[in-house]
């Protein structure tokens, strides 16, 4: 549809840059045909039996490393999507010749190559984040329940994954031979698209998930999983990232509770935004505990809650306390990242649909106590990918030129 609308402008396309949401896994057979649907990033099913099996048949190397980091390995084994398939769908596991991410599958369909971007490797994967490559040690693949030869070839951020095949050109309308460029996951390219590629700036993305990320010059870790570190949108850069899975989804949830009072979601947002501006900070004694799903590091068994309700509270009080609760979670994430990295963030950039809320932005600025800005274009994920796509084919001399374009 997009290529049809472009018409003759298609000839001006210089490259195609791929980004996608992360931590989605799908097995493929030897003919590169999917064996099942995706296990997506929101799927938190665990496989504790994998931990017991690894301990039972552990090699000496596995025992040695486990003696140093037993807890980390056990956690990875239990949360690995490969292990879930191995123990719950053994016939699929046996037939799997490859496992791919969403961007890897798109690359396969567009170029015919079993390749994927280094920057897309997020989640419970046998990926060495510090060195930006697959692990070199066989026992790590035992932990995750997958083989090295089942993983796609990694391509650095900003390099060429392949070119559009004849078949893909016919199916999509894209020019045959068009370069397809490796980028990174959606949150990492958001940081780049927002122009934040130093530790001095943090990027908050207010979408279904609420996340806060800081691009680092070296990997920063937290052994308690209070935040994650993923490969950044640029080689030799890393994104320290804190998130709550249910971010501004909570605002949608609140609308569902009052949907009968409004003709549309937009009407609800408009009325609540106006009314919430007259609610004092603290939402008249209400507090939202925003962990409606688990958080591995802070609250692995969390349940969301609204604390302080009385018969005098109104819906705008509840609405404001939701905005405050989400912003307080972002402050909590920023604090732990700054403590681990020993670096102070000077400015916060907010993007995503939630950044369009004036009252939400002011609450965020107040709680984080830093200069806080939003961009004219709140959807900067595609912009970050386009910057890398342009640089790869010479449209931009460097990333800075792309950011300023």
Task: Report the location of each language-model feature.
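Active-site core segments that coordinate phosphate-bearing ligands/cofactors
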Residues: 47, 54-72, 76-115, 124-146, ...
């Amino acid at each position: 549809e997009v290529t049809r609308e472009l018409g003759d402008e298609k000839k001006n396309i210089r490259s195609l840059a791929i980004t996608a949401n992360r931590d989605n896994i799908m097995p493929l057979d030897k003919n590169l045909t999917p064996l099942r649907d995706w296990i997506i990033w929101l799927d938190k099913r665990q496989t504790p039996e994998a931990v017991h099996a690894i301990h039972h048949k552990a090699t000496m190397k596995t025992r040695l490393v486990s003696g140093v980091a037993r807890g980390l390995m056990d956690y990875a084994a239990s949360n690995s999507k490969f292990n879930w398939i191995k123990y719950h769908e053994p016939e699929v596991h046996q037939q799997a010749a490859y496992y791919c991410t969403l961007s890897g599958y798109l690359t396969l369909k567009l170029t015919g190559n079993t390749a994927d971007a280094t920057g897309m490797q997020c989640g419970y994967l046998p990926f060495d984040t510090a060195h930006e490559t697959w692990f070199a040690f066989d026992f790590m693949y035992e932990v995750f329940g997958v083989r090295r030869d089942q993983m796609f070839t990694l391509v650095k951020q900003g390099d060429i994954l392949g070119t559009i095949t004849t078949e893909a050109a016919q199916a999509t309308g894209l020019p045959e031979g068009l370069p397809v460029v490796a980028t990174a996951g959606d949150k990492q390219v958001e940081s780049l698209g927002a122009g934040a590629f130093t530790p001095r700036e943090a990027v908050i993305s207010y979408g279904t998930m609420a996340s806060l990320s800081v691009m680092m010059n070296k990997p920063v870790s937290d052994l308690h999983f209070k935040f994650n570190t993923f490969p950044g949108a640029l080689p030799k850069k890393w994104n320290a990232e804190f998130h709550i899975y249910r971010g501004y989804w909570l605002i949608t949830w609140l609308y569902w509770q009052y949907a009968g009072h409004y003709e549309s979601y937009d009407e609800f947002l408009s009325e609540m935004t106006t009314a919430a501006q007259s609610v004092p900070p603290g939402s008249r004694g209400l507090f939202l505990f925003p962990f409606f799903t688990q958080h591995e590091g802070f609250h692995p068994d969390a349940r969301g809650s609204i604390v302080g309700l009385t018969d005098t509270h109104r819906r705008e009080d509840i609405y404001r306390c939701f905005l405050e609760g989400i912003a307080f979670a972002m402050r909590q994430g920023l604090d732990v990242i700054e403590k681990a990295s020993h670096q102070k963030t000077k400015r916060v950039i907010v993007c995503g649909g939630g950044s369009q809320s004036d009252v939400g932005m002011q609450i965020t600025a107040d709680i984080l106590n830093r200069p806080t800005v939003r961009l004219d274009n709140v959807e900067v994920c595609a912009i970050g990918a386009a910057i890398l796509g342009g640089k790869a084919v010479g449209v931009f001399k460097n990333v800075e030129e792309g950011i300023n374009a």
